[in-house]
């Protein structure tokens, strides 16, 4: 597809029928880390304007821990996982109560969805979440999504809501993604450094790291940082969804298509949610090591991974689980969904289709990873 101009991207955002808005905890809190109701109300006001004009909004909101640690008597955000999860359990209800009150002033109902990374890794849970959000939007409700901090394991979690928001944008077939943070745009260097300047438009985010040096977040509240926001924008771009990154105070102008923050152009036509899920959300459970011939075929695109070209299988996984496909040097080539359990694969390695059919039966004469379930990385 031809890369759209900044003006075209901004117009597309303004005309978007469905928008996902992500706001981080640092944009909803006071310097002390406690929830700032005034900031929350201002954000809701901007969203309500779009909603009252007939647009659909999905709000991906952090802030459960920030809302909970004050009422529990903590002076600062807890650092150990168990206390964070307990605090999130208390804070999520308080956060939703504030949102319900704020949106209620505009006659808008809200619905809560708490999602873990594992929910996006399992096709059934993914479909259920997509179906629920579609129905909420059909009913005129604003879904408010957050990672389920109270249940998410430390090993498998988003750790921020940036990437989650991009997955949600693809899930609901959004027309735009707005990433709200505590800085007003992407800069060529940390904004505090001399000579740093704002980047108003990124036509191809895959080339971004050649022109931008990203510093760490200056916020002491959020856990995302700029890197995960860029990853979210990249996920949106490769899904065919334009994105805007800006400060929460600019939410209204960003939604209206004004030239605030940094706009990211989509880099390809909208792809399938399934392929985005495989590429970004699925957590690989194992590794299949391809020989040089198979690696070349995989790199060429649209080739299935056959047992004849696989040297080794590592990990414990079931058929349908996501796996890495590596070359012999250990480089990741692709992600895919395994066609067989890890226990079945060793007997298949190095055998062509005719041999597999003769020795093991027809049910083993299929690719280890079918090309429809394989995505290059």
Curated annotation (Swiss-Prot):
It is an enzyme of class 2 (transferase). GO terms for cellular component: cytosol. One of its GO terms (biological process) is L-proline biosynthetic process. It comes from the Bacteria. Pathway: Amino-acid biosynthesis; L-proline biosynthesis; L-glutamate 5-semialdehyde from L-glutamate: step 1/2. SMART domains: PUA. Its EC number is 2.7.2.11. Substrate binds at residues 62, 149, 161. Residues 285-363 form the PUA domain. It is found in: Cytoplasm. ATP binds at residues 22, 181-182, 223-229. Keywords: Amino-acid biosynthesis, ATP-binding, Cytoplasm, Kinase, Nucleotide-binding, Proline biosynthesis, Transferase. GO terms for molecular function: ATP binding; glutamate 5-kinase activity; RNA binding. Pfam families: AA_kinase, PUA. PROSITE patterns: GLUTAMATE_5_KINASE, PUA. InterPro entries: AceGlu_kinase-like_sf, Asp/Glu/Uridylate_kinase, G5K_ProB, Glu/AcGlu_kinase, Glu_5kinase, Glu_5kinase/COase_Synthase, Glutamate_5-kinase_CS, PUA. It catalyses: L-glutamate + ATP = L-glutamyl 5-phosphate + ADP. Belongs to the glutamate 5-kinase family. Catalyzes the transfer of a phosphate group to glutamate to form L-glutamate 5-phosphate. This is Glutamate 5-kinase. It comes from Bifidobacterium animalis subsp. lactis (strain AD011). The gene is proB.
